[in-house]
Amino acid sequence: MKDLKAELEKLLVNAEDCELIARLATEQDKRRTFSRIATQLREIAAELKADIAARSANIS
């Protein structure tokens, strides 16, 4: 479970990094690309968070 929580944290940090890169990018294509990557990472993080919650509920 600790591994999953660590991965969740990494995903969220990477999403924040991509959002920062998107804001600082000078080219429109790069802004869109990094914004899209950030969105995808947040979606994956949400799925992982739900999986962690489901596993925690099963343990209890």
What residue spans do the PLM features occupy?
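Long, non-catalytic architectural segments outside compact domain cores
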Residues: 1-60
